[in-house]
């Protein structure tokens, strides 16, 4: 299921420092496919990765390594990596937690667009009330149990 139906976005990005942005984005598919299938599909995978990278606004940074990217750019790279497998659901763990409020809002706008345009379900963990109120539904947990379920305003 992971790497097919689910994409993961982490607070701390988890980009591989020795790989370029493009290589980080295609890494999940390199793991998914056998060597034979990888080589047969590599051109299509490369084209799809570039399309996604451009969609998240990083087309000009495609050959850069994570150390050459800002926090917001690294989070956009992580989102691109999560999208490469064409998941139905994105699981986002504090995707704005390491970002300033302006960049965090840019990431939220990008995620909202993905939800609306691509009909992706996004399940997000956050402690930030300003971020939570942008969701369609808010589920609050306490001590590992569902406390409330509300439609957002």
What are the roles of these predicted feature ranges?
Residues 1-143:
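ABC family nucleotide-binding domain
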Residues 38-40, 150-153:
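Short, flexible cytosolic linker that couples an ABC transmembrane/permease module to its adjacent nucleotide-binding
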Residues 143-151:
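Conserved switch/coupling elements of ABC/ABC-like ATPase nucleotide-binding domains
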């Amino acid at each position: 299921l992971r790497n097919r139906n689910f994409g993961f976005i982490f607070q701390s990005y988890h980009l591989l420092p020795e790989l370029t942005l493009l290589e980080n984005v295609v890494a999940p598919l390199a793991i998914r496919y056998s060597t034979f299938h990888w080589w047969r599909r590599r051109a299509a995978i490369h084209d799809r990765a570039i399309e996604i990278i451009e969609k998240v606004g990083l087309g000009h940074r495609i050959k850069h390594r994570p150390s050459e990217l800002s926090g917001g750019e690294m989070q956009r790279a992580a989102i691109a990596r999560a999208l490469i497998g064409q998941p139905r659901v994105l699981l986002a763990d504090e995707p704005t937690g390491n970002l300033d409020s302006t960049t965090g809002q840019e990431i939220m706008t990008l995620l909202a667009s993905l939800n609306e345009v691509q009909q992706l379900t996004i399940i997000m963990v956050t402690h930030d009330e300003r971020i939570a109120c942008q969701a369609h539904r808010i589920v609050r947990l306490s001590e590992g149990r569902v406390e409330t379920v509300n439609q957002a305003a």
